[in-house]
């Protein structure tokens, strides 16, 4: 069938860094233990690393929402926690889904690209069916 959704998101790293570890913010319970561990293992700023992952999660949600054009969005509560950005041994990102979103996107391949430039992190997600 081909591409069914495309999403992109940009994140201000300084703004994100101010909020990421604050109790009660949207970011407090958003990242998996693996994502937080990977961020703390990086030589650069953990906030910079997590900002790109937040952008990836948002890009996946936007791609999924776009794939449901003219249909009611079905966004589970705590959806960000069910979208995990993992990397292979060479640092290439991949999205791992769990929970309700994994059921909805079971037959979809998700391609994701992350980048940082200056004070901005960005991600693009493409949803593809075979």
UniProtKB/Swiss-Prot annotation:
Listed binding positions for Mg(2+) are: 9, 58
- Give one Pfam hit by family name: ACPS
Q: Which InterPro entries does this entry report, sorted A to Z?
A: 4-PPantetheinyl_Trfase_dom (IPR008278), 4-PPantetheinyl_Trfase_dom_sf (IPR037143), ACPS (IPR002582), Ppantetheine-prot_Trfase_dom (IPR004568)
Which superkingdom is the protein from?
A: Bacteria
GO MF annotations in UniProt: holo-[acyl-carrier-protein] synthase activity; magnesium ion binding
Keyword vocabulary terms for this entry: Cytoplasm, Fatty acid biosynthesis, Fatty acid metabolism, Lipid biosynthesis, Lipid metabolism, Magnesium, Metal-binding, Transferase
The cofactors it requires, by name, are: Mg(2+)
Q: Which GO terms describe its cellular component?
A: cytoplasm
The UniProt entry's GO biological process terms, in alphabetical order, are: fatty acid biosynthetic process
Catalytic class of the enzyme: transferase
EC nos: 2.7.8.7
Location in the cell reads: Cytoplasm
Q: Which reaction(s) are listed as its catalytic activity?
A: apo-[ACP] + CoA = holo-[ACP] + adenosine 3',5'-bisphosphate + H(+)
What HAMAP family would the database entry show? AcpS
Which family does the similarity line name? Belongs to the P-Pant transferase superfamily. AcpS family.
Q: What does this protein do?
A: Transfers the 4'-phosphopantetheine moiety from coenzyme A to a Ser of acyl-carrier-protein.
Could you identify this protein by its name? Holo-[acyl-carrier-protein] synthase
The species this protein belongs to is Mycobacterium marinum (strain ATCC BAA-535 / M)
- Cite the source lineage: Bacteria, Bacillati, Actinomycetota, Actinomycetes, Mycobacteriales
């Amino acid at each position: 069938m081909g591409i069914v959704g495309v999403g992109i998101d940009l994140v201000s790293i300084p703004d994100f860094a101010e909020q990421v570890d604050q109790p009660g913010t949207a970011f407090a319970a958003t990242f998996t233990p693996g994502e937080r561990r990977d961020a703390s293992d990086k030589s650069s700023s953990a906030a910079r690393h997590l900002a790109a992952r937040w952008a990836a999660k948002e890009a996946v949600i936007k791609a999924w929402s776009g794939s449901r054009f003219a249909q009611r969005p079905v966004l589970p509560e705590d959806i960000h926690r069910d979208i995990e950005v993992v990397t292979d041994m060479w640092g290439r990102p991949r999205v791992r889904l769990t929970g309700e979103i994994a059921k909805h996107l079971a037959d979809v391949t998700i391609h994701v690209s992350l980048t940082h430039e200056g004070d901005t992190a960005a991600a693009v997600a493409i949803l593809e069916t075979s």
